């Protein structure tokens, strides 16, 4: 099982790596995000003063309301670079839309790849995916992409259909099930 080197570093080494990226990230946001440029200006935040993780507390927390009301202002890339639009279910209010590039989807896959790797999942495993990849459920896509990156087998069924679920379990003999309790 391959786990990238950074995942095995000490807390101090990870923090040092993260802090090395802070200036470039903040400059990128200031240049490319209408939302964060406005936040920096309205709160008199000088991004060059933010050097450590602890300094990030100078930036106001982004709320769900911000995401709902100003979603387009978060975009940092041209719209032509957006390959996937996903909207939350809106369980606790209005749905929130996330526009993702290929790089964002790669990061989503990486996050789940690491999670599955930490659970000792390998390319020899087969998972029955009993959640949807659509219908405003972002985690389904994340699980799918993470398992693909890992090289594990995937049986895509989605939720419900108990008889088909059991038939597939008997036919394909998955080593794991991915479900969400309701």
Model region roles, listed by residue range:
Residues 23, 125, 175:
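Conserved acidic residues
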Residues 82, 105, 132-135, 182:
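Short glycine-enriched loops at secondary-structure junctions
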Residues 174-182:
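Adenylate-forming
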């Amino acid at each position: 099982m391959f786990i990238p080197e950074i995942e095995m570093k000490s807390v101090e080494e990870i923090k040092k790596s993260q802090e090395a990226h802070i200036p470039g990230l903040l400059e990128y946001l200031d240049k490319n995000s209408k939302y964060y440029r406005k936040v920096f200006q309205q709160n008199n935040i000088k991004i060059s003063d933010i050097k450590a993780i602890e300094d990030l507390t100078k930036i106001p927390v982004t709320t769900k309301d911000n995401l709902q009301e100003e979603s387009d202002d978060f975009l940092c890339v041209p719209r032509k670079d957006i390959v996937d639009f996903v909207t939350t279910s809106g369980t606790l209010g209005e749905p929130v839309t996330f526009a993702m590039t290929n790089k964002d989807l790669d990061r989503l896959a990486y996050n789940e790849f690491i999670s599955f790797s930490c659970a000792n999942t390998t390319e020899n495993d087969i998972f029955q995916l009993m959640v949807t990849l659509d219908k405003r459920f972002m985690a389904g896509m994340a699980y799918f992409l993470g398992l693909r990156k890992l090289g594990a087998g995937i049986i895509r069924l989605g939720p419900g259909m108990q008889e088909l679920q059991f038939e597939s379990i008997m036919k394909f003999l998955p080593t794991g099930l991915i479900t969400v309790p309701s």
